[in-house]
């Protein structure tokens, strides 16, 4: 056994053993309780970052600890391999996205293997593999057949220079990220999935306080985010009648402008209506109004998301059209508003400036009437400044509302809804913020949508026997539109219905499709005949009786995926259930959203106003007298936009933030592993903070983790020098420990080890891995402090204690634990550490012969006494009064009273 800890040699030996034994291959074993633990699959961007290291180590600790406890545990891995970054890299480097993607996968896989993760690589998938995305296409066709998938027009971001559609994240300040051209909005056809058909069930299962909720193992924050995204709203949908006619003399939209509101109590305060730029009334008015037409064109610039529109300045223009208020008969002016989305509701909203903050600002800007119709007792309305109470529906009472005056919110809504229904112009209605999922992307690197367009037959599904529709692997995007549209070999095909020449659909699927079911494919990764089968039934089976949930037992990933990915995966699972493919309602029983990894951020403005960022290792902090960081300066020369900056140059300190390439505050896991070893990287990311909280990087703490592992190794070296055979035999047969004569010190060591083990076991169950590591540190402290003797009992206590420590540490630092376990002979008696039984707390070790009680004199701590564990009050009092500490601090005074707190302290009042 080497005297000094060499992480490179230790990790090489551990990997050789695991590889030789195919240690992590898992099969379905009905004799064991199953546990499926999965991290969200990564995008193969090129290198792992510390967030990956933290996520996968959490998963690995769970996997290894449960395997030791007798579970059949699956920890798979794959690659979310389609997507825009590969196209961007191809555009930049002139290589096909496939080549860039697979090169990155190979490198990142090596990094994961270096971490020592217990991944079953036989189940590895890549979503860009035709054997995988074939089933995206297959299920899409099933959805099409069931009416869940359908085709309609959609508004997209269009770059007029590149002649291509841009994702929302590619639109920067209203311009295309590559060309800088002003982005336009265009309506183009695309395929949608009816996620709204599942809105109620999606809400029921996630909603806090709902009796139908099943996702009680999810963080409340995520559940609330999903509930808000689904956005169930109860209100009134009603119409403003009109007589606006098109060129053919027909009333537009049957003479009714529909809106939806949750504030029907304010209907008497309507002073305008606003419609989306694409609304039929807006288009009709623009046909004879050049200024309005120009405004509508201007509205097409910029992004299409609700979030982006919320941040834009609200602008509008009158159409010159009027509709009729359904209850008062007054004429209401129609405006075009850049903040109204055609895809939400009916593409129109009622304007009630007095009681809606957005409408209030709009009315002030364009000098529109403001009519107060709700009053909160004791408040005064100011027509020049918004006050929060204007929108308060809980305390408000209607005023200036004719027959509807003097009503509470609930009563007013009911009365207004009844009046509108009697006129045939409205009804109570539930609406959802959730919209059908548009999956068409005008991109190359994605799953081809299996549709053929024929002039005679229309849009024809690709026959199942012809799946997959394989994406060409060798195309290189040039920035001028979708390469598939120019690839004749892909594009040209005969119609499967009539046999005439036709063309393939060139849109590809949203990459969220790929990640909506991959966790099921891990269960049957090589099945060429079915999307899912027996493996999925086993790993995703209903475990309600045992765990209170169903599906995957534990899912781990970032909270940034709280809405889209997790919501789409839930929807996809429910569709697969309804198609008879799976038997579960929800995909993930428990969810852990691990915290971000943060680091210090340092920057400096250049002479031209640009911002340079500097690596933390080139910077040192400047502190004030109280020790607070007040600035920073360079401790090494560093390049900047102003040239090479010398040591001592002042630098701006921005605090801590998420590790980022753009801010030069990331830490390369590869460099960390090479310098300190994978075990140190793993240990540090687990010890520094609880898994669900953010982790603030600290180089000194990394060094501390490495020193701790050296201490463990050094203790193992000391232990290797003693004769351990008899002690190992005793430890291997737990029953025989009862026959071992433990001395006072050995009993104290066992008490400490087993007390800590009891807490560590609980912490493992809670996935509080930071306190698991703290417990391991307490164990090594106790072992190092133990004054070993040649007695058999002392050696057994040492061997038992260190064996427990190695098993406690193994899930966190498997390499060093494995090598020490082997070198010290534990494997020969207790078996390979891979499947060694989890250590059990020994009840006899927790039984104390003696107790240490704190001694107080007149309430002040003055020392301690030791008494027999069975000592009664009289014996404890006698020991206290006889102690040196009492006589020293009593100063000859007689005791008046002795107060005993059992198991803790004795207070003598003199």
UniProtKB/Swiss-Prot annotation:
Subcellular location: Cytoplasm
Catalytic reactions on record: tRNA(Leu) + L-leucine + ATP = L-leucyl-tRNA(Leu) + AMP + diphosphate
UniProt keywords, alphabetically: Aminoacyl-tRNA synthetase, ATP-binding, Cytoplasm, Ligase, Nucleotide-binding, Protein biosynthesis
SUPFAM superfamilies assigned to the protein according to its UniProt record, in alphabetical order: Anticodon-binding domain of a subclass of class I aminoacyl-tRNA synthetases, Nucleotidylyl transferase, ValRS/IleRS/LeuRS editing domain
Predominant localisation class: cytoplasm
Flavoprotein keyword on record: no
Signal peptide (residue range): none
UniProt KW Cytoplasm keyword: yes
GO cellular component terms listed in the entry, alphabetical order: cytosol
Molecular function GO terms recorded: aminoacyl-tRNA deacylase activity; ATP binding; leucine-tRNA ligase activity
Residues binding ATP: 661
Family of the protein in this entry: Belongs to the class-I aminoacyl-tRNA synthetase family.
Name of the molecule in the record: Leucine--tRNA ligase
Organism: Acidovorax sp. (strain JS42)
